[in-house]
Amino acid sequence: MPHQQMLILFGLLPVATNISTWWNFGSMLLACTSMQVLTGFFLAVHYTANINLAFSSIVHITRDVPYGWMMQNLHAIGASMFFICIYIHIARGLYYGSYLNKKTWLSGTTLLIMLMATAFFGYVLPWGQMSFWAATVITNLLTAIPYLGTTMTTWLWGGFAINDPTLTRFSALHFILSFGIISLLSLHIMLLHEDGWSNPLGTNSDIDKIPFHPYQTYKDLLMLSLVILMLLMTVSFLPDIFNDPENFSKANPLVTPQHIKPEWYFLFAYGILRSIPNKLGGALALAMSIMILLTAPFTHTSTIRSMTFRPIMQLMFWTLVATFAVITWSATKPVEPPFTVISQIASTIYFLFLIMNPILGWVENKIMKHS
């Protein structure tokens, strides 16, 4: 009976009538989380967290375990789908002013940070060349922290270099953080239902709402079927599209890859890190590239919530999207001119968006007041 009541309550959940397709990505992320946990469990059953056996265990999963290739590809490509959905979800939040639901936005940003940490630890687990060197470069950034940096790095590595204890720790952290994500995700959804959804107009939704079921349910199911179709098409026909060729070789500490880079979904942050020729400055910029999202609810000065009616901010928003793409592209290139200059200009524009947000809001208010 309690389950039936829950279903009835969920079906009767009041939702704004005018929410568009951009509001579907939240439920897509819930589906992605479920798939990642499920496929991750089956991979963990066969995986061995040992530097001599990790790479071989991944080969064993893909070759010998029934449907192991599918589990491995679903988990790896599923992570890329996860980040595509989450970046669209964040962009929608910025565009339509969803960040004004402070608790929901802050819990969501914390969730993003935890998700990025989990994905990073997971990328190290296959113990390929790029896994090893990406781990070396990124964890080395901790040494930039004054006084505590070296101690923290040694503690994280479990020694004075990346070795077997590091892989064991990363495996344990990747496993435990997924449960942290589920907990924080539940909190995020609860806070969302407390504050209520925003809508494309940025107005109060209370005056015009409909039950979640059937309209929104079918809308979500349609989107989910399209996402699953895209995922299965990629897994079946282009399983290695997001993989780095270097990662098909076992980790070798004596051979450095020509160009060290993380997965594509971290390239924007990595590009910002590389654009600053100072270790501490780069590490701070890397942290700020994500942390700056936390400032959005506190720097909103416009009397209008959504960018639907803010043409100047729309221009700034699409500049941010283009900048994100440019930083991602430049991070795949060698550290040499003109790519370093492009990265530096793009990184400056990236941070400028969230600095310009309050200034443009204030300017818009003045224009509307005098018109």
UniProtKB/Swiss-Prot annotation:
List UniProt keywords, sorted A-Z: Electron transport, Heme, Iron, Membrane, Metal-binding, Mitochondrion, Mitochondrion inner membrane, Respiratory chain, Transmembrane, Transmembrane helix, Transport, Ubiquinone
Name the residues that bind heme b b566. Answer: H89, H188
The cofactors required by this protein are: heme b
Q: Which domain of life is it from?
A: Eukaryota
Please give the Gene Ontology molecular function terms for this protein: metal ion binding; ubiquinol-cytochrome-c reductase activity
Q: Name one GO cellular component term.
A: respiratory chain complex III
UniProt xrefs under InterPro entries = Cyt_b/b6_C, Cyt_b/b6_C_sf, Cyt_b/b6_N, Cytb/b6-like_sf, Cytochrome_b, Cytochrome_b_C_euk/bac, Cytochrome_b_N_euk/bac, Di-haem_cyt_TM
What residues does heme b b562 bind to? H75, H174
Quote the cofactor binding remark.
Binds 2 heme b groups non-covalently.
Q: Report the locations given in the UniProt record.
A: Mitochondrion inner membrane
User: Transmembrane residues, as ranges?
Assistant: 25-45, 69-90, 105-125, 170-190, 218-238, 280-300, 312-332, 339-358
Any one Gene Ontology biological process term? mitochondrial electron transport, ubiquinol to cytochrome c
* Annotated membrane topology: Multi-pass membrane protein
The residues the record assigns to binding a ubiquinone are H193
- The residue stretches assigned to a coiled coil in this entry are none
- Disulfide pattern: none
Q: Which Gene3D superfamilies match?
A: Cytochrome Bc1 Complex, Chain C (1.20.810.10)
User: Assembly and interactions?
Assistant: The cytochrome bc1 complex contains 3 respiratory subunits (MT-CYB, CYC1 and UQCRFS1), 2 core proteins (UQCRC1 and UQCRC2) and probably 6 low-molecular weight proteins.
Q: What does this protein do?
A: Component of the ubiquinol-cytochrome c reductase complex (complex III or cytochrome b-c1 complex) that is part of the mitochondrial respiratory chain. The b-c1 complex mediates electron transfer from ubiquinol to cytochrome c. Contributes to the generation of a proton gradient across the mitochondrial membrane that is then used for ATP synthesis.
- Please state which protein family the record places this protein in: Belongs to the cytochrome b family.
Print the miscellaneous field. Answer: Heme 1 (or BL or b562) is low-potential and absorbs at about 562 nm, and heme 2 (or BH or b566) is high-potential and absorbs at about 566 nm.
Name of this chain's protein: Cytochrome b
Species source reads: Eryx elegans (Central Asian sand boa)
